[in-house]
């Protein structure tokens, strides 16, 4: 290693120290999804980031999605994917496959990646320890021609109605890193598939997490000139939605961030999961790596 490389590493470590102290014993929930999940190199970088958070005294919790993998498995089994208003319809046969892919295949892949770093990860879903209960999601869509709202029947797509933090509190006091799939039971005995973003927000809110990070395929919230906005208050976010700066698929993402803050999360970050080590850059550097939304 050259002298210049040593100096750069020393500066980075010096910059990280106060942030390590700030986040010691704090809970950070990371929603892992998007392009990063399909890239082995980015997957290994993500796992090492989570391991380093744990080694630095942080309590990291991973929540993951898996929409593309679910679609691929349904195609493989000859089951047509149905969508209503852009949302997957989950019938009884589909929800079994969703649970198999999310809580089985994907969850264990992430657990294995983190375990390969030398840390201990444990795979869970909302069913474990009665951690999460859900109910059937109530979604409506407005007809653009008649302006009349109609109710969407999405089958076994759910919304979180209750989070019991007992198991997560036990794990926080251990060496374990929870990796959670967004599948949960209802009081009616059915299994529900839950949007991973809202599931992560519910977990983070119940734990009063210091940070909730959403790893996406975009750098964060951009202004009208395409520049990254580093920080927004909830009021500013509402204003940017109203004036069209925040539009399209970013609107539900930002709305989920604001709901999480309302539930008790201290700050929510939208950042680019396609950037290697974006989690560490966000948490342990002054510049951060995405858009921070605060109360």
UniProtKB/Swiss-Prot annotation:
Keywords: Amino-acid biosynthesis, Arginine biosynthesis, ATP-binding, Cytoplasm, Kinase, Nucleotide-binding, Transferase. It is found in: Cytoplasm. This is Acetylglutamate kinase. It comes from the Bacteria. It catalyses: N-acetyl-L-glutamate + ATP = N-acetyl-L-glutamyl 5-phosphate + ADP. Its EC number is 2.7.2.8. GO terms for biological process: arginine biosynthetic process via ornithine; L-arginine biosynthetic process. It comes from Sinorhizobium fredii (strain NBRC 101917 / NGR234). Pfam families: AA_kinase (PF00696). The record marks 31, 253 as: Transition state stabilizer. InterPro entries: AceGlu_kinase-like_sf, AcgluKinase_fam, ArgB, Asp/Glu/Uridylate_kinase, Glu/AcGlu_kinase, NAGK-C. Substrate binds at residues 66-67, 88, 193.
